[in-house]
Amino acid sequence: MDRVFSVEDISDQFWSPPAREDSSKLVMNRSDSEWAFQSFLQQASALESSQPLPSDPVPVAGDVKNPVEIPANVPVDSEDYQAYLKSRLDLACAAVALTRASSLKPQDSAALLDNGSQASNTSQLVSQVPPKGSGHDLSKEEDKEALAATATPLLPALQKKSAIQVKSTTSGSSRDHSDDDDELEGETETTRNGDPSDAKRVRRMLSNRESARRSRRRKQAHMTELETQVSQLRVENSSLLKRLTDISQRYNDAAVDNRVLKADIETMRAKVKMAEETVKRVTGLNPMFQSMSSEISTIGMQSFSGSPSDTSADTTQDGSKQHFYQPAPTSHMPAQDQKIQNGLLQVPPVDNLQQHSASGPVEGNKMERTSSMQRVASLEHLQKRIRGGVSSCEAQVSGKQ
């Protein structure tokens, strides 16, 4: 608590002038505050003639409990005593400042200098009061009161700075925690009791902490969304892998069936070529066989039509045209014609082939149906070629007649 001295607080007596000391004694050789304050107390005790004052390395802050009566009617030089008090006060302020300078930040030291200036202003107020008494005891008590007035405004400021520094350290170590109500309450109390600069710094700290908390929440929400998308993509990937496995299995089965069908087609082609060669050997012997093959082709076409009327007409035909299938008498025919007739007996008629194919099992294999259709197609091709040869032979016979 700051103490302001007024004119009413000072008694109407003059102070005794202190003895002038050399300037070399006033210079502080060490930077340690304790030694400086000890020298100050020793110099103050040297002014006493009757009772010495023990040295105390700890600065005293507070009111004087045991006041000493001021002797009356002691002449004193007011200007010299004011200069002496001012020098003592500056020395005490410097000692306290050096003590706290090592543990404070630059902004804290600036605040300390402000408090020092306030203390100097207080000392100026004390020095402006005209002294009215003199005495060694009065000078000693006045020095103590001036030192108490100087230390009193300094100590609360230092306590505030240290409390704010401790709070900032605590808040910096607990940034990872999202909610810390106790610290917020402590910082609010510090803001109320501190100066405006500390309040601004605390508000800035709170805003930074709040922004960091919001950013952590946004990151957490973003990570949750990404994890959900990853799980969905994994499910879709597993379903696509199953479909791919199924499709690949079907493709392998289709490839095997394709190879089997190709082998069957090659086999049927070889059989068709062998049948064509056999037909060529038979049809190239005698033109008389071409006329008989024309009848066979007409019968075969009627049987291939598939209508019930055609098949019934084929069954009700007279036997006048069936002499192509019966062997002729061999008495008036040459040996070559007999060989041709014997060869015709070996060729199965188309009707028999159609009946054989129709009498087969209905529930046959797919490959057997394909082979039978290929045989029918090859026979139709042969019949077309035979009909072309028959027409040319008939033209030659009509020309000879």
From Swiss-Prot:
Localisation: Nucleus
Ranges of biased composition (kind: Acidic residues): 179-188
Residue span of region Disordered: 113-146, 160-199, 300-322, 352-372
Annotated region described as Leucine-zipper, given as residue ranges: 226-247
Gene Ontology CC annotation, any one: nucleus
Domain called bZIP: residue spans: 198-261
Molecular function as annotated in GO: DNA binding; DNA-binding transcription factor activity
Bias (Basic and acidic residues): 134-146, 189-199
This protein's UniProt keywords: DNA-binding, Nucleus, Transcription, Transcription regulation
Polar residues bias locations: 115-127, 300-319
Residue numbers spanned by region Basic motif: 200-219
Keyword Transcription set for record: yes
InterPro entries linked: Basic_leucine-zipper_C, bZIP, bZIP_plant_GBF1, bZIP_sf
Annotated function: Binds to the G-box-like motif (5'-ACGTGGC-3') of the chalcone synthase (CHS) gene promoter. G-box and G-box-like motifs are defined in promoters of certain plant genes which are regulated by such diverse stimuli as light-induction or hormone control.
Family membership: Belongs to the bZIP family.
Protein name according to UniProt: Light-inducible protein CPRF2
